[in-house]
Structure formats: structure tokens, C-alpha cells
């Protein structure tokens, strides 16, 4: 089982909590977080609205088809996203910061723009705007604890998120099937930090341990599942670990609903490299290199790479990028 951390422990014993936080991210790269302060009513609301959206007919969901969005926002049908060139068996909505399109934008700045919001169910936009606010605050709080635990100033990461952070919410449903095992293929998250809400009873998430063994990660009551992204691994010279994970497709007559929240910095931000204390640096594994999935210094380059690979239909339709077949999940 993954480590379980209680954020309320930081109120009485900040040093002890920070040590446990650092070591969980070093040893596994994944942990459960309880005592996070997000109200149960807010959690229940976003899960209920997610269910209501996915229960609608296909033509209603496709009113906000991602094919209409050069910014890769909106609804993706089942099979509309790829990981490692293979189809993921899920449907989803992608929600980012609502901003004006930049005229004449090039490269990753083409990711900036408006969301495609569903007209139903009622209250969907307001609920997920509030969700973004709550989880951004929670994620930044964790980052400050990590910074101190690594020997840095508490605010060392703040500047990267101060203006125009490129956060991302995915509202995801995995339908049951007997035709494939890939709900989402094995991957690492390309950003900084992920906070995952899983509907109670929704199984299927697996995490790869350093030994190569895959373990099941069932939802835990009142907990978020938290994992490290590649940029935080780079920032710590590999001391903190971005861990490969996947979701198995549910069996027939079942499904799985989850809402991952990706805490990402501004598109043009570069995450600072932490000068680790000697005793931590000695335990660093170094950054894992993948020639098929390079990690760039600025977040936007990583985001653009991930989006265009994961959604080749949108990339080709709006940006003239031919499918390469070597996609990765975001």
C-alpha cells in the first residue's frame, strides 16, 4: 500500500510532516493525502456533475468536442487520446485556464485560450472553477513543504506559478470493456504535481515500483492520490521520483470515474534546480532519460509535446502536425 500522509500533521509538527512528505516522494513518488482541507461537499459535487455529464447522449457531449478547440480543450470521445501510440479506453473533458487566445501565437503559446464548457448539467462550470481554485492552493501548499524539506527557501517554486499557471483538470470516465486492458497506458506525468480524485469503488490504477513490480492503488476514503511529475524530478536531480503508472480498463458492465488535477507552472516557466544538501544529494538517483520522450527546460515545450502526441487528430486538424504514432499521455 502507498504511504498515507495527513496534512493536518504539518500544523503541529511541520518538520516531521516534511520529512515524511520528502521520503514518500523519494521512495515511491506516489502517496495518499488525507487531512487536505477540501470539503466533502465540494468533492461530492464534482463527482456528481461528472456522472451527469457522461450519462448524457453522445450528441450532447460532442457539442464541446475537442476537435473544435485548437487549445485541446473540451470533450474527447472514447479512443480520442493515445498513450505510447495506443488507444486509451476512456472519454474525458479537458479544462484549463480560461484566457484570451494570443493572436499569431507560435509553439506552446497556442495552448492558451478558452475552455469549451458544457451547457448541461447546470453548475458544471462554477463547480470546476471552484475546484481549480481549491486544488491549486492545496498543490502550492505541498510544494512549499517540499521546498523546505529539500533545504531550499519555502517560496523557491512560487515564481513559476505566480502568473498564468497552466493548470489542467481532466474529468475522466473509463467504460467497461472486454476488448482491451488499456484504460490509459503506462506513463509519467510531464508537469510538476498531480492530485487525483477517484470515485469510491473505482479500481484500476496501478503504480510501478522501483523493482518493476506493478501494484494496485485503490481509492482511499477521504484521500487524494498524489504523484510527482517529471519537472519536479528534474528540479531535484532525481531525488524526488516521477513514477510510471497506468489504468487498467474496467471489466464489462462496470466503469471508473476519476478527476486528475495537474498543477503546472506558466507555459514559459522554468522550474528552478534545487541545490540539495549533501546527505540528500548522495541519495539522488539522477533523472531518468528517455530518448523517445525528452524533458525540456520550459514547461510549455513539454506540454506542447504531450498534447500533440496524445491528441494527433486535433494537432493535425488545427496545427497541421502529421500523426507520428509515438504518443504519450498527459
Predicted regions and their residues:
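C-terminal flanking tails of non-heme Fe-dependent oxygenases
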Residues: 1-84, 89, 130, 136-330
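Core domains of carbohydrate- and sulfate-ester-processing enzymes
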Residues: 79-105
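A short, charged helix-loop
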Residues: 97-127
Amino acid at each position: 500500500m502507498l504511504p498515507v500522509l495527513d496534512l493536518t500533521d504539518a500544523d503541529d509538527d511541520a518538520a516531521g510532516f516534511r520529512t515524511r512528505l520528502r521520503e514518500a516522494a523519494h521512495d515511491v513518488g506516489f502517496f495518499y493525502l488525507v487531512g487536505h482541507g477540501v470539503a466533502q461537499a465540494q468533492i461530492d459535487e464534482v463527482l456528481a456533475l461528472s456522472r451527469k455529464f457522461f450519462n448524457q447522449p453522445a450528441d450532447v457531449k460532442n457539442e464541446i468536442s475537442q476537435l473544435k478547440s485548437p487549445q485541446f480543450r473540451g470533450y474527447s470521445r472514447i479512443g480520442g487520446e493515445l498513450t505510447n501510440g495506443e488507444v486509451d479506453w476512456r472519454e474525458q473533458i479537458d479544462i484549463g485556464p480560461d484566457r484570451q487566445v494570443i493572436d499569431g501565437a507560435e509553439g506552446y503559446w497556442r495552448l492558451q485560450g478558452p475552455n469549451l464548457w458544457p451547457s448541461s448539467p447546470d453548475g458544471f462550470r462554477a463547480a470546476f472553477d471552484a475546484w481549480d481554485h481549491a486544488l491549486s492552493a492545496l498543490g502550492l501548499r505541498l510544494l512549499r513543504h517540499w521546498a523546505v524539506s529539500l533545504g531550499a527557501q519555502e517560496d523557491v517554486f512560487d515564481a513559476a506559478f505566480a502568473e498564468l499557471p497552466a493548470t489542467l483538470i481532466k474529468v475522466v470516465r473509463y467504460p467497461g470493456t472486454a476488448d482491451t486492458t488499456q484504460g490509459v497506458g503506462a506513463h509519467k506525468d510531464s508537469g510538476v504535481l498531480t492530485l487525483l480524485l477517484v470515485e469510491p469503488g473505482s479500481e484500476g490504477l496501478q503504480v510501478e515500483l522501483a523493482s518493476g513490480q506493478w501494484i494496485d492503488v485503490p481509492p482511499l476514503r477521504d484521500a487524494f492520490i498524489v504523484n510527482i511529475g517529471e519537472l519536479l524530478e528534474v528540479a531535484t536531480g532525481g531525488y524526488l521520483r516521477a513514477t510510471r503508472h497506468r489504468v487498467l480498463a474496467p471489466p464489462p458492465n462496470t466503469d471508473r470515474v476519476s478527476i486528475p488535477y495537474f498543477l503546472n507552472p506558466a507555459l514559459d516557466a522554468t522550474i528552478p534546480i534545487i541545490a540539495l544538501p549533501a546527505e540528500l544529494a548522495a541519495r539522488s538517483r539522477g533523472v531518468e532519460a528517455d530518448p523517445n520522450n525528452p524533458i525540456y527546460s520550459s514547461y510549455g515545450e513539454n506540454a506542447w509535446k504531450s498534447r500533440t502526441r496524445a491528441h494527433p487528430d486535433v494537432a493535425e486538424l488545427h496545427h497541421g502536425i502529421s500523426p507520428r504514432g509515438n504518443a504519450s499521455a498527459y
